[in-house]
Amino acid sequence: MKLHDLKPAPGSTRKSKRVGRGHGSGKGKTSGKGMMGQKARSGPNPYPHFEGGQNPLVRRMPYKRGFTNRFRVEYTVVNVGDLIEWNNGDVTPEALREVGLIKNLKQPIKVLGDGDLNVALKVRVHKVSASARQKIEAAGGSVELIDAAA
């Protein structure tokens, strides 16, 4: 048996330290509460974000109004007019990335109808606006929607 193996007997309890009973006890005078101040007084302490009567940070900030949908899907937008320079007939997320029209392949892509199109393209994206679909099909192309998880 060594000193670090010593343990109190099972079920034994230690007497609580009596505070405020003289300097010799080690917990005399201020009873472990330090010097003056609100925390040294009897009764509850001020709440955690209390700033001493100054207008609190929570009240200095403007209201956050409205609601944020956690499941909102952010789309990378590509316009029909951006696809004009396309020589290749297939428009896919990978091809758009190579050309530099999009940066992130993880974000789904939506094609919008701004601009004109006179080349037949096979467009494979996650979403297409009605006007973009109309312009692509009018130019002799086709639209195929792909799953967002893919």
From Swiss-Prot:
<dbReference type="InterPro" id="IPR036227">
    <property type="entry name" value="Ribosomal_uL15/eL18_sf"/>
</dbReference>
<keyword id="KW-0689">Ribosomal protein</keyword>
<feature type="compositionally biased region" description="Basic residues">
    <location>
        <begin position="14"/>
        <end position="26"/>
    </location>
</feature>
<keyword id="KW-0699">rRNA-binding</keyword>
<keyword id="KW-0694">RNA-binding</keyword>
<comment type="subunit">
    <text>Part of the 50S ribosomal subunit.</text>
</comment>
<keyword id="KW-0687">Ribonucleoprotein</keyword>
<dbReference type="GO" id="GO:0019843">
    <property type="term" value="F:rRNA binding"/>
</dbReference>
<dbReference type="InterPro" id="IPR005749">
    <property type="entry name" value="Ribosomal_uL15_bac-type"/>
</dbReference>
<protein>
    <recommendedName>
        <fullName>Large ribosomal subunit protein uL15</fullName>
    </recommendedName>
</protein>
<comment type="function">
    <text>Binds to the 23S rRNA.</text>
</comment>
<feature type="region of interest" description="Disordered">
    <location>
        <begin position="1"/>
        <end position="56"/>
    </location>
</feature>
<comment type="similarity">
    <text>Belongs to the universal ribosomal protein uL15 family.</text>
</comment>
<dbReference type="GO" id="GO:0006412">
    <property type="term" value="P:translation"/>
</dbReference>
<dbReference type="InterPro" id="IPR001196">
    <property type="entry name" value="Ribosomal_uL15_CS"/>
</dbReference>
<dbReference type="InterPro" id="IPR030878">
    <property type="entry name" value="Ribosomal_uL15"/>
</dbReference>
<dbReference type="InterPro" id="IPR021131">
    <property type="entry name" value="Ribosomal_uL15/eL18"/>
</dbReference>
<dbReference type="GO" id="GO:0003735">
    <property type="term" value="F:structural constituent of ribosome"/>
</dbReference>
<dbReference type="GO" id="GO:0022625">
    <property type="term" value="C:cytosolic large ribosomal subunit"/>
</dbReference>
<dbReference type="Pfam" id="PF00828">
    <property type="entry name" value="Ribosomal_L27A"/>
</dbReference>
